[in-house]
Amino acid sequence: RVANRDLGDIMQTTIVDDLRAKYDPNWNRRAIWDRDYSEAVRPNVPGVLLELLSHQNFADMKFGLDPRFRFDVARSVYKSMAYFLADQHGYEPVIQPLPVSHLRTEWIDSGKLKVSWEAVMDPLESNAAPDAYVVYVARDEGSYAPGQWVRENHFVLDEIEAGVVYRFRVAGVNAGGESMPSEEVAAGQPFGAQEVPTVMVIAGFDRISAPAVLEYGSFRGFADFEDEGVADGMDLSYVGRQYDFDSQSPWLDDDAPGHGASYSTLETQVLTG
């Protein structure tokens, strides 16, 4: 129980400190409960039950529907577990790097393919910088081969086979582990390449966002007819367009849930960001 209390305190402190630094300096810190909830009491390992947002609180949901916020909270939860374990075993915690950015490929001398990228520093964690990188390479529609370790922020593929599309992902690594993978880039050389001009494809779309917010008098909600937002990767949570924007609309039953009610036309869909 004492370990649970320590883990809960570390987790709450980490989340609140990070959210105050990145989103709202007045983010409220609530009390920690010590209750006999079986999910946290019965397992013979430290555990906490985390309640961060309320779906009935419009201000909370403006954060909760933002994929950037969700990533940051998830990282805070991971960091708190790293802090807890480090304290238990008496070592200095090192936090895994953030995913790299600005991934690109280019042809260089003698038909070699160069992949380069930039590290992303974490302003909240001074020791989260990458010490090295793992480059993953796949051919055509095949799976990724085991990664190749490099110290610099570039990698050169020497042997290029004509007619094959090479796909790349990169992850940063340090003593704390491996970052989440980067986006994927690809390049290939068609047969008879000396007669074919080089074509460069630029991925100019890197936006992720919550849906548009509607606040006008007593009308509040998420106006996806103006901006649906963009998921980070894939989204399983979006079930359909909101149709009840009246904040005074009461809950009657599950078929008439009142303010915030939405259609369920997309319940089975996985949306790509």
Positions of PLM-derived features:
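Short beta-strand elements bearing conserved aromatic residues within extracellular beta-rich modules
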Residues: D131-V135
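Pro/Thr/Ser/Gly-rich low-complexity, intrinsically disordered linker/stalk tracts
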Residues: Y83-N127, A162, G176-P197
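Active-site-proximal beta-strand/loop segments in catalytic clefts of secreted hydrolases
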Residues: R1, I10-I15, R35, E51-F58, ...
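Active-site-adjacent mobile loop/cap segments within catalytic or ligand-binding domains
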Residues: D24-Y91
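Active-site-adjacent substrate-binding region
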Residues: V2-D34
